[in-house]
Each structure stands twice: as C-alpha cells, then as structure tokens.
C-alpha cells in the first residue's frame, strides 16, 4: 500500500518519492546507485525523527486519525487466535461500528471489544465512521456481561470520533446506553484492559474504556471533545483547532502526567501505520504484563481500584 503523508510530513514525502524513483532506475539499469539510496534513506529517517520529536497536539491529532492506522480488527488478527465475532444487542440491531467476540490471547480465553472504522467509502459508511449508536454500546455491554458470566478477562480497543449524534440514536437512548456501560463496567467482576489505539472521543470512547488498566498508543488522543468541536464552540471557527488541541491536553504523555493513563505504548518511527508488526509487538507486551498483574490482584481490590479511578476523573488540584 502506498503510504499516505500528512501535511506536516511533506518533506518526508518528497524524500520518499526520490528514493522510489532511484529504486526504479536501479532496477532498470546496470548503474549501481545503492549508496545514494542508502544515503537518502538515512536522511529520511533522520528527518522523520526530527519532525516527530516535536509534534504539536494538533499534529498528534492528525496522526491519531491517519487513514492507514491499524484498527481494532487489525489488532484482533495479530494478537488473538480463534476469534469468533458475536453480533447484535438483542434489542434493536447489530451496530458495525463496534466489533467484538470470543478469542484466545496467548492461549487464554478472553472477550475482545472495540470500535471499528472503515478503509474505503463503502466500509466507512457501513461502520458509520467508527461512531457507535446505542445498539453498539449495548452489544459491547452484552459481550462484557458474557465475559463476566464465564470468568473471562475483557480487552477493549478504543478508536472513535465519538458516539453518533443522530436523531435516531438519541431517540433510542444514546446517553442511557453510555451511562449504563460506565455503571456496569465499574462492577464487572473480571479484569478489564483498555487501550486507546487512535481517537478517544468523549463519552463514545469512555463507554468501553473503564478498566483496571488504561493504555494509550504514543500518537493516540483522548479528550472530552475534538479540537475542531471545541474551537467551533469557544471561538466560533474550526480554524482555532490547534489552539484548542493545546488547551485540551489530548495527548498520551499529558494524560499520563494527570494519572488518567497507566502506560503510553511506544509507536514505530512515523506512527503505528508505518510498521504494523512492531506496533503489535509493543501492544502485546504491555497487555501480557497487565493481564498477569490484574489476575494476581484480589477481585475486591480490583473493583475498588477501578471504581476509584473513574470517580477521580475530572478532579485536579
């Protein structure tokens, strides 16, 4: 797949194009230009390191939405075996913006749930751009309660702009569905591990992100509102999105300092989409460690700690 470059990555894109052109020449002629290709590759890596070492919150927000970033089903394919997807909320419909089911993680049975976006136009529409309706959250809760019934740990992957704000969703109880998930997750009698892999948009993210451990990928975001939405409310223009991103504190490092996130998972150079394999290794290592820790903690302590965590959200000094 041809890499997609964001606006601030254009210098990297230009070098990449030059490297591709030289590789084409190398293949078509007897002239050895491998040294020049290696020189440009090193220059590209150095430039990428330089750019990504000083990303602004607004730029990190762009990376978190990158169209080639791994989505929940990519993590399920890479980290789990024997995945059996389960469908429907048993009340209204099956929401394709939420995927989940039974799987094995290192041979251990678990329940995995996450938001799912689409790659092409047809799939984006089917997945509603990763914005769940109430039936999506009710499906997620049904799967989590199934996990509780059979004593299976729950792993969730968060990547959504937010809960879908359509009239139908509101009529079917969007806020009730989110609130019910928050309530039930604080009481779920199995370990719950949550990982923000892209966008963590408001209550739409939090509805599957109440857990014993909350992780964020290095270039993911987590916020009560998108920078554009915040700018539109406060400044009446989305052009102030960069200022809003700075003020909101949406980045993983910032949220870890506020004790809202346990672990910031390092991403490969250039972001998770540049190296799926390394990203999966990094995520798996963290989840393995946390699952072992969570299963060694007495259930009463686990539930108490989880409840205290969510009740501390919004407190600051």
Curated annotation (Swiss-Prot):
Return the protein name: Acetyl-coenzyme A carboxylase carboxyl transferase subunit alpha
Q: Which InterPro entries match?
A: Acetyl_CoA_COase_a_su (IPR001095), ClpP/crotonase-like_dom_sf (IPR029045), COA_CT_C (IPR011763)
Give the protein's function: Component of the acetyl coenzyme A carboxylase (ACC) complex. First, biotin carboxylase catalyzes the carboxylation of biotin on its carrier protein (BCCP) and then the CO(2) group is transferred by the carboxyltransferase to acetyl-CoA to form malonyl-CoA.
A Gene Ontology annotation in the biological process aspect, one of them, is: fatty acid biosynthetic process
Q: Name one GO cellular component term.
A: acetyl-CoA carboxylase complex
Q: Name one GO molecular function term.
A: carboxyl- or carbamoyltransferase activity
State the pathway, as annotated in the record. Answer: Lipid metabolism; malonyl-CoA biosynthesis; malonyl-CoA from acetyl-CoA: step 1/1
Subunit structure, briefly? Acetyl-CoA carboxylase is a heterohexamer composed of biotin carboxyl carrier protein (AccB), biotin carboxylase (AccC) and two subunits each of ACCase subunit alpha (AccA) and ACCase subunit beta (AccD).
Listed Gene3D superfamilies: 2-enoyl-CoA Hydratase, Chain A, domain 1
Q: Out of the domains of life, which is the source?
A: Bacteria
- The residue ranges of the CoA carboxyltransferase C-terminal domain are 39-293
Protein localization: Cytoplasm
According to the UniProt entry, what is the EC number of this protein?
2.1.3.15
Pfam families according to UniProt? ACCA
| Keyword Manganese annotated | no
Please tell me whether the keyword Nucleotide-binding is annotated for this protein: yes
Record NCBIfam families: accA, AccA_sub, PRK05724.1
* Principal place of residence: cytoplasm
Broad class of enzyme this protein falls into: transferase
Q: Which UniProt keywords apply?
A: ATP-binding, Cytoplasm, Fatty acid biosynthesis, Fatty acid metabolism, Lipid biosynthesis, Lipid metabolism, Nucleotide-binding, Transferase
Q: Which family does it belong to?
A: Belongs to the AccA family.
Catalytic activity from the UniProt record? N(6)-carboxybiotinyl-L-lysyl-[protein] + acetyl-CoA = N(6)-biotinyl-L-lysyl-[protein] + malonyl-CoA
Q: Which residues form a coiled coil?
A: none
Species this protein is from: Neisseria gonorrhoeae (strain NCCP11945)
């Amino acid at each position: 797949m041809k890499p997609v470059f964001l606006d601030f990555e254009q210098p990297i894109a230009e070098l990449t194009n030059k490297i591709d052109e030289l590789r084409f020449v190398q293949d078509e002629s007897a002239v050895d230009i491998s040294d020049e290709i290696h020189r440009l590759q090193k220059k590209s890596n150095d430039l990428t390191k330089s750019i990504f070492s000083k990303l602004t919150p607004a730029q990190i927000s762009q990376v978190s939405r990158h169209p080639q970033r791994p989505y929940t089903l990519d993590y399920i394919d890479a980290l789990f075996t024997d995945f059996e997807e389960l469908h429907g909320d048993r009340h209204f419909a099956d929401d394709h913006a939420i995927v989940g089911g039974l799987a094995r993680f290192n041979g251990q049975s678990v329940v995995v749930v996450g938001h799912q976006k689409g790659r092409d136009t047809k799939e984006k529409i089917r997945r509603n751009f990763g914005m769940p309706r109430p039936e999506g959250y009710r499906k997620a809760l049904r799967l989590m309660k199934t996990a509780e019934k059979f004593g299976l740990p729950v792993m969730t992957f968060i990547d959504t702009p937010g809960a879908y704000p359509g009239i139908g969703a509101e009529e079917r109880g969007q806020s009730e569905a989110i609130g019910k998930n928050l309530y039930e997750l604080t009481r779920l009698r199995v370990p719950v591990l949550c990982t923000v892999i892209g966008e963590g948009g408001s209550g739409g993210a939090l509805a599957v992100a109440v857990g014993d451990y909350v992780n964020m990928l290095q270039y993911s975001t987590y916020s009560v509102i998108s920078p554009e939405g915040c700018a539109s409310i406060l400044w009446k223009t989305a052009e102030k999105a960069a200022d809003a991103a700075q003020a909101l504190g949406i980045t993983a490092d910032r949220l870890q300092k506020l004790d809202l996130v346990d672990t910031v998972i390092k991403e490969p150079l250039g972001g998770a989409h540049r190296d799926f394999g390394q990203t999966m290794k990094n995520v798996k290592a963290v989840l393995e460690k946390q699952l072992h820790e969570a299963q060694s903690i007495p259930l009463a302590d686990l539930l108490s700690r989880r409840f205290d965590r969510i009740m501390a959200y919004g407190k600051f000094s």
